[in-house]
Amino acid sequence: RDRSVSRGLGDVYKRQFLDRDDQEMVNFVYKASEVCAKYKMLVDFHGVFKPTGLQRTYPNVLNYEGVNGLEQMKWSSEKEFDMVTYDVTIPFIRMIAGPMDYTQGAMRNAARGNHRSVNSEPMSQGTRCRQLATYVIFESPFNMLCDAPSNYRREKECTEFISNIPTIWDETVSLAGKVSEYVAIARRHGNDWYIGALTNWTPRELDLDLSFLGEGDYTLELFKDGINADRAARDYKKEVIPVPTDRKLKIHM
């Protein structure tokens, strides 16, 4: 590693397939964090147990997996794993422990009943906008784009939106939620607010209270499920609208 540092090679250490939480592996995680801190390297532990506060000792540890991330869709059928319901459960449970490396961002999306586990061309359960919203909902200081580069080149509008979402936040406001049913969160970075909302397989409307914005005029760049999203999950619509003066926003998912 000394040779790599002298050449200026690499700033992020992503360690995969730890797959254990016995004492030996816990010791390894602590030692790896210490060594990476010495060499001023950031760390993302993938395939590891949930966080337990290590990032407070070693702030260079940005992220942990410790979650059934989107990669599960490569080998799990809809019957075997209901990812859509899982996504509106983990913000209330797993995310309490700390950040999670969920590896989202699928551009191939499948409506209910249409998902297939295809290892070479994996797809997500649920809509395209669902994938976008997870970048706001899920706490993750070091985010990923899980899909193939060719898919992102084809989907430039969504890719540009994802790439502009911050990964660290100055303020977080819980807007609505019920475990395993729906969740809506607003997060602020600087002067900009980002709002994400997810539902389970049940279509629903939410009335969001945006009074936290305070006075002034705001413009909302909105990505929402398209009219056919329940059948064609990639269907979405982008709008740019003024935030209502009464600070009430109705969304349909």
Feature locations, PLM:
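Single conserved hydrophobic/aromatic residue that forms the stacking wall/gate
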Residues: 2-13
